[in-house]
């Protein structure tokens, strides 16, 4: 009814329709005044924003085929590089609808990108629900539990030529890297070509650290193993606590860090919690 609250989804739908609707312009004046619908839209001709579709093929630290030469805040859609209005790294590999703000001939930035419905099939499997690696139709596959309350497993088939992104960087496909047995993390599988097989495998493999001390140079010492993690300007890193991005200096003793490090140790993704570490004392 007219008194019901409108959902965010419907607001977005109505806004998009309004922005993309063709404009009406006056083509006759005086007694012959009339209006005609043109090919112009509010989005393109007034706001200087164009809409397009494509696939995000590279981000600042990696691409779907290897390394990346992009700067921070840039993405590549198909074969064209854009600046971005916010971090879109989580859309690597996805087919997206995107909006480009045109400020000038050489000044274009993507202000919004969204996965295209029905053109991306993804599945995230946590290490807790990971069962084992297996095969299906001659291809590597992952057997996993649908949830924690069932003993029944499902199987996800991985394409024979699938791309592997391990802890944020491209790697040659390696079964050992996608085997989450006795590990902490998750796997996201993406079928971007709708053939029923997953063609991109994103692995996040975390190592947990309990902060003992943090130096002014970015050296973080683990409280129980004395292992050292160094986050300084020689590496790329991002530290998040909840939805907030924080700095090394914000870390405190007993913070629990889940650290995903690329194999070359040049890229680190760190998630921070204040969870209490539980365990059993096995010796004096």
How should each PLM-predicted stretch be described?
Residues 1-129:
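Terminal recognition/anchoring or ligand-binding modules at protein termini
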Residues 180-182, 229-262, 273-277, 282-284:
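Extended non-catalytic domains of envelope/secretory-pathway proteins
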């Amino acid at each position: 009814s007219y008194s019901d609250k409108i959902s965010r989804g419907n607001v977005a739908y109505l806004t998009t329709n309004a922005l993309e609707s063709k404009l009406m312009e006056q083509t006759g004046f005086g007694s012959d005044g009339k209006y005609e619908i043109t090919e112009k839209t509010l989005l393109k001709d007034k706001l200087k924003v164009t809409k397009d579709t494509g696939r995000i093929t590279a981000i600042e630290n990696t691409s779907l085929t290897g390394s990346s030469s992009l700067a921070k805040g840039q993405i590549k859609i198909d074969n064209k590089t854009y600046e971005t209005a916010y971090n879109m790294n989580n859309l690597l590999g996805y087919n997206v609808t995107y909006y480009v703000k045109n400020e000038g001939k050489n000044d274009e930035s993507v202000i919004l990108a969204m996965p295209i419905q029905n053109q991306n099939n993804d599945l995230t499997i946590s290490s807790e629900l990971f069962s084992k690696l297996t095969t299906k139709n001659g291809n590597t596959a992952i057997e996993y539990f649908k949830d924690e309350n069932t003993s029944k497993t499902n199987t996800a088939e991985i394409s024979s030529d699938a791309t592997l992104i391990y802890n944020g960087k491209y790697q040659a496909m390696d079964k050992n890297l996608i085997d989450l047995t006795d590990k902490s993390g998750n796997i996201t599988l993406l079928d971007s070509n709708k053939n029923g097989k997953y063609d991109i495998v994103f692995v996040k493999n975390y190592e947990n650290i309990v902060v003992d001390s943090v130096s002014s140079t970015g050296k973080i010492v683990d409280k129980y193993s004395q292992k050292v993690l160094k986050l300084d300007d020689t590496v790329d890193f991002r530290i998040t606590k909840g939805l907030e991005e924080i700095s090394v200096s914000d870390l405190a003793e007993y913070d629990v860090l889940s650290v995903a490090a690329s194999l070359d140790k040049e890229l680190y993704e760190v998630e921070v919690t204040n969870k209490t570490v539980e365990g059993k004392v096995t010796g004096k």
